[in-house]
């Protein structure tokens, strides 16, 4: 039985978040070397031992006033080693849901830290393939962006001077 390549193809969506601010690069390197502030370190992925694996919560801020705080979702964040390239610190970053993983997006990208900003740039796969892509266009992209904004704000608190 043949499968249609279009139905098995992984659909991803670009996601880029930039947070301007004054970043202490030495503090960022220190924070990226010990991730206990981000969550509970867990076993490294066997297929990518250079990554550090952290169990944490990702926040979705609710901005319409209907909730007093963010919605939280247990997640695993993978971070590669911090590499200094000129005036930038570059770190591979990925995350996925810690439970019901097929129902939530999976992100992979790069974190770029400079003295003036923090940039998260990558792609995520919406859940449930092409249907998820349609849902993403209607609503889920907003959820993904707010979640990424909240994570970058959390990183900024650890990095900024």
Q: Where are each of the predicted segments found?
A:
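Short amphipathic alpha-helical segments, especially helix-boundary/capping motifs
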Residues: 2-5, 85-87, 129
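Hydrophobic ligand-binding cavity/cleft-lining segments
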Residues: 1-71
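Surface-exposed beta-strand edges and their flanking turn/coil or helix-capping segments
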Residues: 30, 104-108, 131-135
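Short, low-complexity, polar/charged sequence segments that are solvent-exposed and flexible
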Residues: 34-37, 110-115, 137-142
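Hydrophobic-ligand binding "helix-grip"
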Residues: 40-49, 61-115, 123-125
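Solvent-exposed, well-ordered amphipathic alpha-helical segments
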Residues: 14-30, 47-51, 76-90, 113-117, ...
